[in-house]
Amino acid sequence: MRIGFLGFGKSNRSLLKYLLKHQEAKFFVSEAKTLDGETKKFLEEHSVEYEEGGHTEKLLDCDVVYVSPGIKPDTSIIKLLSSRGAKLSTELQLFLDNVDPKKVVGITGTDGKSTATALMHHVLSRRGFKTFLGGNFGTPAVEALEGEYDYYVLEMSSFQLFWSERPYLSNFLVLNISEDHLDWHSSFEEYVDSKLKPAFLQTEGDLFVYNKHIERLRNLEGVRSRKIPFWTGENFATERELIVHGKKYTLPGNYPYQTRENILAVSILYMEMFNELESFLELLRDFKPLPHRMEYLGQIDGRHFYNDSKATSTHAVLGALSNFDKVVLIMCGIGKKENYSLFVEKASPKLKHLIMFGEISKELAPFVGKIPHSIVENMEEAFEKAMEVSEKGDVILLSPGGASFDMYENYAKRGEHFRELFERHGGDKV
């Protein structure tokens, strides 16, 4: 048997290491970029054939090709493989094929999925279960096959689900769906279909928890599992209360809108698993939200600073804005072909001043109209401008609305830069 790897990113690296231990086969790695010396040494030591700097027809000789999630469907090598009937799969699919689906909790959504995944892992672990945390969040799922776990909590991206043939699992949560990754997916409909793929594979004994607004995007009549929507009369959250199955519970703290949505969705899963929420609310007390997600940094001269660098879509930015009355907003990065006219219409009542830099400024600028705005060159200039146009009591919010790769290695580096500027300007930390 000959197994191919199209792209050699994090997930395919973990998959190859697993298969080298557990399967007799010949392996072939095809990577568009140049492989580093350490990677080449590893491949050569394990007699793994490879090519770099592009993909060739050698992949056609493989019985199965594992696709890295970031590979776009319209690439020439994918078109070639598909035209020849090649079997394509993913690291995620191999994992799901080798575990009890009842132990898997899959979480997806346009925004908030990392926080929800971390929260689900937190409450299960603190309850005493040996719980694996991974998927699109940190550790590739296949690494969990080397151990024994009570539960596997996985963040799932639309890319992973698109390339997985049959991602079946018993517990599935969809937080929200809005326009995103339209630079990767051929249409919004394809994006929605990818996100919801596991739901339509579930059977009557399974559980599907989802945001009610999804019913406007896709007919869910074909889903056979138990469907529980939230943001309904029975399941919703206010600033101080959680309502699950019509019963009220007091939240143990103050949370921004996005975090309340995560708490609400995860609490429903928890209720279905354990038939009570009192312990969930107690465990929630010591859950620490992830950085770069509505992270309150502190104050400078009475101005309040928030780092929301993880917000890489306009939907996420609107969610951040919903927590405030008027905001000095910093947006930057690479946009995702969203409807910026509609975004500006929805955001404008919340904006005291809009500061933009990076590629997204070119896409946003034609729509800002009479909104006070500035276009700057970089984060340093954006920070200075925010200080200049704000006054005591104002909120200064970094919520980029775009990917970071035009100027930063990732969203975390972008958020760290914003935090460094805050500290350099004498910010009083929380």
UniProtKB/Swiss-Prot annotation:
It is an enzyme of class 6 (ligase). Transmembrane segments: none annotated. Keywords: ATP-binding, Cell cycle, Cell division, Cell shape, Cell wall biogenesis/degradation, Cytoplasm, Ligase, Nucleotide-binding, Peptidoglycan synthesis. Its main location: cytoplasm. Pfam families: Mur_ligase_C, Mur_ligase_M, MurD-like_N, MurD_N. GO terms for cellular component: cytoplasm. GO terms for biological process: cell division; cell wall organization; peptidoglycan biosynthetic process; regulation of cell shape. It comes from the Bacteria. It catalyses: UDP-N-acetyl-alpha-D-muramoyl-L-alanine + D-glutamate + ATP = UDP-N-acetyl-alpha-D-muramoyl-L-alanyl-D-glutamate + ADP + phosphate + H(+). Pathway: Cell wall biogenesis; peptidoglycan biosynthesis. One of its GO terms (molecular function) is ATP binding. ATP binds at G109, T110, D111, G112, K113, S114, T115. SUPFAM superfamilies: MurCD N-terminal domain, MurD-like peptide ligases, catalytic domain, MurD-like peptide ligases, peptide-binding domain. Belongs to the MurCDEF family. PANTHER family: UDP-N-ACETYLMURAMOYLALANINE--D-GLUTAMATE LIGASE (PTHR43692:SF1). Cell wall formation. Catalyzes the addition of glutamate to the nucleotide precursor UDP-N-acetylmuramoyl-L-alanine (UMA). This is UDP-N-acetylmuramoylalanine--D-glutamate ligase.
